[in-house]
Amino acid sequence: MKYQKLENQESNWKWIYLIRKHREGENITRYEERSLQEAKAQELLESQNYPSQIEEWIKNHLSPALPIKLDQAIRARRKRFFNGEKQHTKKKSIDLEYAVWLRLSKYSRKMKMTLSETITYMIDERESKAQFENQMAAMKTSLKNLLK
């Protein structure tokens, strides 16, 4: 396991996930009867600040269709949570027009790099080009001064 499990935090994430699914109208319980579904969902709603009750509720009442989805959602949340702690693993998003993204993507594949590596490479190339241009301009002025 790459990321440490935080039981209380993950119970809260599970609670948030299940309540959101319930509010979207999905049956989060293993029961077919609507009144029983509502009662069990209300029971889960009331156990928000009690991680052990949330885990017990999940063990006893969770719909058979949800365990895999729930585990995937928690695994993704755990990854984002731990990656967000360190600056070098923290993800940022930028808005790109589709045409720009497409060109960048093609260039990345051609260079066999990730998008981030390609952007860094392009910035480095531009900076070295600017530095070269400055050196050339300085050499031209010194040559002109020398020839006077």
Curated annotation (Swiss-Prot):
Subunit structure and binding partners: Homodimer.
* Gene name of the record: matP
The listed locations are: Cytoplasm
Q: Which Gene3D superfamilies does the entry link to?
A: MatP, N-terminal domain, Met repressor-like
Which terms are listed as keywords in the entry? Answer: Cell cycle, Cell division, Cytoplasm, DNA-binding
The free-text function statement in the UniProt record for this protein reads: Required for spatial organization of the terminus region of the chromosome (Ter macrodomain) during the cell cycle. Prevents early segregation of duplicated Ter macrodomains during cell division. Binds specifically to matS, which is a 13 bp signature motif repeated within the Ter macrodomain.
Q: What protein am I looking at?
A: Macrodomain Ter protein
- Is DNA-binding among the key words of this record? yes
InterPro entries with a match to the protein in the record:
Arc_rbn_hlx_hlx (IPR013321), MatP (IPR009390), MatP_C (IPR035375), MatP_N (IPR035087), MatP_N_sf (IPR038339)
**Gene Ontology cellular-component terms listed:** cytoplasm
Family assignment from sequence similarity: Belongs to the MatP family.
Pfam families, alphabetically?
Answer: MatP, MatP_C
Q: Which GO terms describe its biological process?
A: cell division; regulation of DNA-templated transcription
Q: Does the keyword Transmembrane apply?
A: no
Cystine connections: none
MF terms from GO for this chain are: sequence-specific DNA binding
